Each structure stands twice: as C-alpha cells, then as structure tokens.
C-alpha cells in the first residue's frame, strides 16, 4: 500500500495496534456502495473506461456476497475495511481493480462510509422512536381519566391523569425525534471527492456521486469534509438527550413498581427474579436503560475529547471515532427496542394511584383558586389553604373531609359549593385548556400526537 516510501516493514505490533479492520469491517456494505458510485462517476466523467468500470462493479458485488456469506477473510495486515475490500477486488478482477482508487483517498472514503452508515442507523432509530411513541399514545388514550398524583420534589402536588403523565413522556420523545431528523440533514452531506484534503486533479463530478448515494448535499470544503466529525458528535448529543429522557422515565417506572408506590405492573417477561429471595420481581429493563444512559453520555465525551485538539486535516486520532459511535448506536437501539415493547404494556394500579393522590392534599391549589375567584387575593388565599391543610393534618383527614364550618373558620368566602372543587375528578376537569390534564384535553393531545407522528412516517 505504501511500500515505495519505506525502507523497512512495519513492526508487527504497530501493524496490529494501528489496524482498524477489527471494528470498521462493519462499514463493508457502505464502503462497497460508495466504491460502486465512485467507479460509476469515474466512467461518466471519462476518467475510467466503461469496460473497466463494469469489471470493477461486478467484482465489488462478488466481494459483498462473500462478506455477507461470512466467507471473506479479513486481514489485519491490510489495516482496514477499505484495503481489505480493494485487495480482494484485485484478487478477483486483476490489475484493473487497482484503478478504483483513482481520484479518491481513504480520508474521504471513510468519511463517506461513516455518513452512509450513520444515516441508515439514524433512520432505524427514528422508526423505533415512532413505534415507541405510537405505543405511548395508545396507552395514554386508555387512561385519560385514571387519576394519579402529580409530583414536585417527589411530593404529592396536584392530581393529574396517568394519560397526561404518559403524554409528557411522548412530548420528550417527540423533541428527541425532531433533533435526530434535524441531525440527519447534516449527516446526509457527501464528503467523497475531497480526496486526502485538497481535492483531486481529476475532472470529477461530485453531483453524480451524491445523487447515486442519495446525499442531499455535498460538503463544500475538502479540508473540512475529511477532518471533522461534528455530525457524529451532534448525533451522539441527540442520542444522549434521548437516553437522558429514557433514564428519567426508567426512574419513574422503577419507583412506581416498588411496594412503597405500587402504581404500575410490568409484564413478567420484562423482569427478572433473585437467586436468593423468592419473592423478588426486579425491573431490570428500566434499570439497565437507566444505567446504559451513562454509556452514551460517556461516548459523547469521548468524541468531544477526541476532536478538541486536532489541527486540520485528517489525523490518525480519527480512527478512534468509530467504536464510540458504534457503541452509542447499539446501546440506543437496544434501549429503544426494549422500551417499545415494554412501555405500552404497563398496567397502572388505579386504586393505589387514587389512594396516593388522596393522601397528599392534592386539591389544595384548587381550594386556593376557588377563593381567588371569590375575590380573595392569591397570597391571602394561599395562607387560608395552608391553615386548612394544617387542620387536615392534625385531624388526619383530607380537605374534602373537613366540614363546611371547619373550612369557613379560615375564610368567610368559602361557600357550600366548595366541595365540588375538592374532588379529584373536579380538579382534573377544571384544567380544561391546551396542555392541561382534563380528560378531554388529554384525548385531544393524543389525537394531535397521532397527526404529528405522521410527519416522520
């Protein structure tokens, strides 16, 4: 590959240390796809003869068949996926195979491979996200009036519906989907034709290659095209935010499954037991997703640290970009697959959720709002309700269980109709506006969600 310049062979340890074929063979299909497009462009531009290109393309198809059949012999001595493919191509078609690399460097070749691979993986991840969100919409629709506590500081705050809470998850994931769709636009720019760093002296037409490979744009500067990996960092950043959201969801499910909450049940197939405690049903799937978020965060830091001090253009450091990206994609894909199957099958324990809501004076804000509508300043209403809650705590009862006389001792603005506003159902129904937890609003949110998901179909 470069023997003409050197006076001695590469040290065997160095050859193994610098080889990437152990992991970048994952790009084989995309590498061959890019080579076929490159060869076709060379023919269209009159740089290679049509017969030679036909021979090269036939040979590349044979190489791909061997790889897919598991019959390909990968060689560390050939360093990477590119040289392994090219060497086998030359074995098959002879010296004409050596013409394939005309007007191309491994620098723009690998940058193209990464983008082709990541574009495909991004599409797969978006499809999984849409599937997961569709399942959440189904779950939310079933529970628009299933009452549960809404929390702040993990303390009971106000009543919400389980469906409303699930729709909060949906909104998080929807923004994640938008981020990935937006990142895909920058992934889908073609670096091929940039050669090593300065372009090529051959009269190539990059628009031909871009069209053949489905790129929507062409990298405008050859130095930038071969040396930056910001598109991979952006993807990993979006993946990190997504995993953060899934980790938060996991934490809630883990808490809700505990005996202390007992809000939800997860089907047994998503749980494991204990080797010593026969009673245990452990939420391993959400626990692992919560843990795997740390891996994705770490890969983002790896890529940022990898790029932070590199001068233009390509450096061998960039060989280290692949394994973090592979791990990020694999971890995210596995987590989404698990969630897409598990989350829509969660069963809420309605009675326990309702009972928990009754314990926390969740309608206190409703009583304050009631007083405000009767002319009491909010800060005064806040104090009145605080006193009423203190009495409820002392008596061991909910606000709705206090008598009218007990409530009126704190404010003469309280009338007999107050109890209509202290029911959990009344509290939900009162929040009847866009984004509110009223059952009707949650139903509308689900309907809008289905329409919005169609944008990603």
UniProtKB/Swiss-Prot annotation:
Keywords of this entry: Amino-acid biosynthesis, Arginine biosynthesis, Cytoplasm, Lyase
One of the Pfam families matching this protein, by short name: ASL_C2
Metabolic or biological pathway: Amino-acid biosynthesis; L-arginine biosynthesis; L-arginine from L-ornithine and carbamoyl phosphate: step 3/3
A GO molecular-function annotation: argininosuccinate lyase activity
Reactions this protein catalyses: 2-(N(omega)-L-arginino)succinate = fumarate + L-arginine
InterPro entries, sorted: Arg_succ_lyase_C, Argininosuccinate_lyase, Fumarase/histidase_N, Fumarate_lyase_CS, Fumarate_lyase_fam, Fumarate_lyase_N, L-Aspartase-like
GO cellular component entries: cytosol
CDD domains: Argininosuccinate_lyase
GO biological process: arginine biosynthetic process via ornithine; L-arginine biosynthetic process
Chief place where the protein resides: cytoplasm
EC number in record: 4.3.2.1
Family, per entry: Belongs to the lyase 1 family. Argininosuccinate lyase subfamily.
PANTHER family per the UniProt record, alphabetical: ARGININOSUCCINATE LYASE
PROSITE patterns registered for this protein in UniProt: FUMARATE_LYASES (PS00163)
Claim: Amino-acid biosynthesis is one of the keywords in the record: yes
UniProt name for this protein: Argininosuccinate lyase
Top enzyme class: lyase
Localization terms from the record: Cytoplasm
């Amino acid at each position: 590959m470069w023997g003409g310049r050197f006076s001695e062979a590469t040290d065997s340890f160095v050859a193994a240390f610098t080889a990437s074929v152990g992991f970048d063979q994952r790009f084989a299909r995309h590498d061959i796809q890019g080579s076929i497009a490159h060869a076709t462009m060379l023919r269209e531009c009159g740089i290679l003869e049509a017969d030679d290109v036909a021979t090269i393309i036939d040979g590349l198809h044979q190489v791909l068949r061997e790889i897919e059949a598991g019959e390909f012999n990968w060689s560390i001595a050939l360093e990477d996926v590119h040289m392994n493919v090219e060497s086998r191509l030359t074995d098959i078609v002879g010296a004409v195979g050596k013409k394939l690399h005309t007007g191309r460097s491994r620098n723009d070749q690998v940058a193209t491979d990464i983008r082709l691979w990541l574009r495909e993986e991004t599409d797969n991840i978006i499809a999984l996200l849409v599937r997961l969100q569709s399942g959440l919409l189904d779950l939310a629709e079933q529970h628009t009036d299933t009452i549960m506590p809404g929390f702040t500081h993990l303390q009971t705050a106000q009543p919400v519906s389980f469906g409303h809470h699930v729709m909060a998850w949906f909104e998080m994931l929807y923004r994640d989907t938008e981020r990935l769709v937006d990142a895909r636009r920058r992934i889908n720019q073609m670096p091929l034709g940039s050669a090593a760093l300065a372009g090529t002296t051959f009269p190539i037409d990059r628009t031909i290659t871009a069209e053949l490979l489905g790129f929507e744009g062409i990298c405008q500067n050859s130095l930038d095209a071969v040396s930056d990996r910001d598109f991979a960092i952006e993807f990993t950043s979006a993946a990190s935010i997504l995993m953060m959201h899934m980790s938060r969801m996991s934490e809630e499910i883990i808490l809700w499954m505990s005996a202390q909450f007992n809000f939800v049940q997860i089907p047994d197939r998503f749980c494991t037991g204990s080797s010593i405690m026969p009673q245990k049903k452990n939420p391993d799937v959400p626990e692992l997703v919560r843990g795997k978020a740390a891996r994705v965060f770490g890969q983002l830091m790896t890529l940022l640290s990898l790029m932070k001090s590199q001068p233009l253009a390509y450096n061998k450091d960039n060989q280290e970009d692949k394994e973090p990206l592979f791990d990020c994609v694999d971890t995210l894909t596995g987590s989404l697959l698990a969630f897409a199957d598990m989350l829509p099958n969660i069963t809420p324990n309605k009675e326990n959720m309702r009972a928990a809501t009754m314990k926390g004076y969740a309608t206190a804000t409703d009583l304050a709002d009631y007083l405000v509508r009767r002319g009491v300043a909010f800060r005064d209403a806040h104090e009145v309700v605080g006193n009423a809650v203190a009495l409820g705590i002392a008596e061991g009862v909910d606000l709705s269980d206090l008598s009218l006389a007990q409530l009126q001792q704190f404010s003469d603005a309280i009338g007999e109709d107050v109890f209509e506003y202290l029911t959990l159902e009344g509290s939900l129904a009162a929040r009847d506006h866009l984004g509110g937890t009223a059952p009707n609003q949650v139903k509308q949110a689900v309907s809008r969600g289905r329409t919005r998901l169609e944008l990603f179909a």
